[in-house]
Amino acid sequence: EVGEADRAAWPDVPMAELCKQAIDPEIGRDTTVFLAQDKAGHIGAGTSTSGWGWKYPGRLGDSPIIGAGSYADTRYGACACTGVGEMSIRAGTARAVVLYMKMGMSVEEAVHEAVDDMRALKGGLIGRVTIHAIDAAGGPKVVAVNGLPEYHYWLWREGEAAPASHPA
């Protein structure tokens, strides 16, 4: 845990311990995904980054790469990914999900096809990836692959007093 002495010494603190804490599943948190649709039907997608715990020098995660970490097209839907970003980068996962919906697949079919794309890569699907998607009507689908056995996401629909947790 980062203590007062570490805070006082900042930035001259051992970074290895801070990195270890940032990637500890009991302490650290994942990338945050936001998929939204306004009253006019416009769709947007955005992701945070999981922080610098896995961002060692030279590594770029998928969050800032449109088409890998997130993608939206109001005509078809939106998608954003969390987990091992290299998998989403290699497969262009977020763009692929939206493209599959453009080709006529349901949001559920599109997400599962994108998972198959990642599994078909040389070396297969390595690590944990979660795909969050909505179709043009706002219908959600979330699939967690190689991840937590009980993954939940939050959904807030118009007219609801608060967001509700749903299993993936």
Where are these regions (language model features)?
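N-terminal nucleophile
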Residues: 1-168
